[in-house]
Structure formats: structure tokens, C-alpha cells
Amino acid sequence: MDTTESAESAHNPARPPSRSRCPPSAQPGSEGFWRPWVRTPGEKEKRTGPRAAEALPSGPGMAEASGKLLQYQHPVRLFWPKSKCYDYLYQEAETLLKNFPIQATISFYEDSDSEDEIEGLACENQSN
């Protein structure tokens, strides 16, 4: 902001002062926000430190006493066949949520071995 601009904004209260033009990542204070997908240097040391082997005696991804897996690489995506989307909604949702974190995204995929196709093939084989 040059001196004429600062003088104008001081005399004209209706005109707000101009903002800095630095990019959003370089603005002061933005480094304080926690982003789960960005690892801090402290987290990297925790995972690679000497106690990492003690924390995971059975190997990475093994279940602990509560039955949940120990480590995840976020964001977590769970792939679920489209033919079983109602199974997820009604029957297996409780089991799925017990075994996986709530911050997981369920991605449906087209499965070629759906029950409808299997039943159709079975009917064709019986008629031949």
C-alpha cells in the first residue's frame, strides 16, 4: 500500500484498507490448521522411531485387542461392490463400522460377479 492509498483510507472510513496479496498458503496463521493428510515432522519421527517395532509387535495393520486395525494411510477408501450396497446399508453396516474408522469413504464399484448375473447363468445352464 503506498502513502496516497494509506492517506485516503485514513480519511475515508467507508473504504476498507487494501488486503495483502500473498497466496493463501503463505498467509500468517495458516500453518496452525491441522490437516490429517499432511504429516508433521513429529509424526514422521513417531512412526520411524525405535519404539515403532514395540508398538506393532505383530506387524503393521494387525488387529489389536479392540479388533480395530492399528495404522491407516489417510484418506481411507473402502471398496464395496454395487451389488451389495443394500447389504452395507442394512445388514453389514455395524460390522463394517466396527472394523474401520468412521473417516473412511465407501467407494462402490461395478462387480462382474453380481448375484443377478450368476442366477442368469445358472438359469441358462439348466435350460440347455
Swiss-Prot record:
Induction: By MESP2, and acts in a negative feedback loop with MESP2, functioning negatively toward MESP2 to regulate NOTCH signaling in the anterior presomitic mesoderm. One of its GO terms (cellular component) is nucleus. Coiled coil: none annotated. The keyword 4Fe-4S does not apply. It comes from the Eukaryota. Pfam families: Ripply. One of its GO terms (biological process) is somitogenesis. Its main location: nucleus. A motif (WRPW motif) lies at residues 34-37. InterPro entries: Ripply_fam (IPR028127). It is found in: Nucleus. Residues 1-64 are annotated as: Disordered. The keyword Nucleus applies. Residues 17-28 have a biased composition (Low complexity). The ripply homology domain is required for transcriptional repression. Belongs to the ripply family. This is Protein ripply2. It comes from Mus musculus.
